[in-house]
Amino acid sequence: MDLLNTLVDKGLRREPPTREEALAVLATSDDELLDVVAAAGKVRRQWFGRRVKLNYLVNLKSGLCPEDCSYCSQRLGSKAGILKYTWLKPEEASRAAAAGVAGGAKRVCLVASGRGPTDRDVDRVSKTIEAIKEENEGIEVCACLGLLSDGQADRLRSAGADAYNHNLNTSEETYGAITTTHTYADRVETVQQAQAAGLSACSGLIAGMGESDKDLVDVVFALRDLDPDSVPVNFLIPFEGTPLAKEWNLTPQRCLRILAMVRFVCPDVEVRLAGGREVHLRSMQPLALHLVNSIFLGDYLTSEGQAGQTDLDMIADAGFEVEGAGTTTLPRHRADALSGGCGTRDATAGSGCGSHEDSGAGGCGSHGGGAGCGPCGGHGEREPVAVADSAAGESVPGARTETSGAARTDLVAVRRRGAGTDLAPNA
């Protein structure tokens, strides 16, 4: 296909596709799917080889969130039967993190539900970061605490945080359809505060809320303009007890097209396969490794993930290798840009995801049972499919009608182990 040849050439030069080209990727047929994966795989290997970065989530505070994000199992009014607990002590969080590190994770993502941290919360998390770093030499720590107030990003950076995650979730145009308690602009501002403080920014999306192809392209191009170092891609976990419980809009093929499109738009950025991969990609997960260069190991915030050893076996069987602790995740040009300051960018590459380098930071873009690391601690995606307080199943006018995937509620399991419990974690 001429389209794919063009996209590969652009990706190898760190040049973004046009919006029309990105839309065309999402519109490819199932017969063309393996060609799409192969093309995006060339771009992935150019910048990341066959390495896969492992990240590990620690849910510091679960449930009881005052925000009304429709996709999130921790939202205000959620009837999902998830674990609910207040802040873990620093030593408890450090023990949980150690399990992930022992399993091969080079980054620990600390997540807390809520609109955003108080100054006291930042002090608490700072102590947790220090405890984790003291026990695990060389480990990266990403914080995901919601909307930040002035000075909080600087304090987290001073405590040793390497990165901060806050997902855009969806396009600005449709953001009001998924939450009413904060705005798209609030999210953008928090990512920019993290960047200004010298933290590696992580910001991504959620697919599967009934969005159109245009919606997906809009949010990915917005992310490119925002220029995070890591872009986590979540797939909605339709948790019973949330407004989107009936939204089973994804197929494995659709998920692969979305991941390929993100890779073409953000060729040299850490693209992370985040929450919902087990539910929607299922046996097609190994193919996704040709598109992404980062995954979460083990469980998510409020939902169970694939067994940690199964993740490791999948990576090896697909011919990839776990990225070592001493390896810089992102290409040299992006790493050099980050070390030179957040504003350092390569003018030849344009702005956005293809230009400014990451310290290797990934981000917490995984949903904890239904959402990402946004204020609600779930997976940060947008959903034009339903307004924040509507019943599940109400469609937003103009949303693309995608062939629905089968409702695999058997694959959605609440996390009952690890952080906040007495049971050993999955890592």
UniProtKB/Swiss-Prot annotation:
Binding site for [4Fe-4S] cluster: 65, 69, 72
EC number from the UniProt entry: 2.8.1.6
Pathway: Cofactor biosynthesis; biotin biosynthesis; biotin from 7,8-diaminononanoate: step 2/2
Alphabetical keyword list: 2Fe-2S, 4Fe-4S, Biotin biosynthesis, Iron, Iron-sulfur, Metal-binding, S-adenosyl-L-methionine, Transferase
Region of interest (Disordered), ranges: 383-427
Residues the entry annotates as binding [2Fe-2S] cluster: 109, 142, 202, 272
Pfam families: BATS, Radical_SAM
Residue ranges of every copy of the Radical SAM core domain listed in the record: 47-277
Catalysed conversion reaction: (4R,5S)-dethiobiotin + (sulfur carrier)-SH + 2 reduced [2Fe-2S]-[ferredoxin] + 2 S-adenosyl-L-methionine = (sulfur carrier)-H + biotin + 2 5'-deoxyadenosine + 2 L-methionine + 2 oxidized [2Fe-2S]-[ferredoxin]
Cysteines joined through disulfide linkages: none
Gene Ontology BP, a term: biotin biosynthetic process
Molecular-function GO term, any one: iron ion binding
Group of enzyme by EC: transferase
Cofactor remark: Binds 1 [4Fe-4S] cluster. The cluster is coordinated with 3 cysteines and an exchangeable S-adenosyl-L-methionine.
SUPFAM superfamilies: Radical SAM enzymes (SSF102114)
Cofactor requirement: [4Fe-4S] cluster; [2Fe-2S] cluster
Record text on subunit structure and interactions: Homodimer.
PANTHER family xrefs: BIOTIN SYNTHASE (PTHR22976), BIOTIN SYNTHASE, MITOCHONDRIAL (PTHR22976:SF2)
Stated family: Belongs to the radical SAM superfamily. Biotin synthase family.
Job of this protein: Catalyzes the conversion of dethiobiotin (DTB) to biotin by the insertion of a sulfur atom into dethiobiotin via a radical-based mechanism.
Protein name as catalogued: Biotin synthase
Organism name: Streptomyces griseus subsp. griseus (strain JCM 4626 / CBS 651.72 / NBRC 13350 / KCC S-0626 / ISP 5235)
Top-level taxonomy: Bacteria, Bacillati, Actinomycetota, Actinomycetes, Kitasatosporales
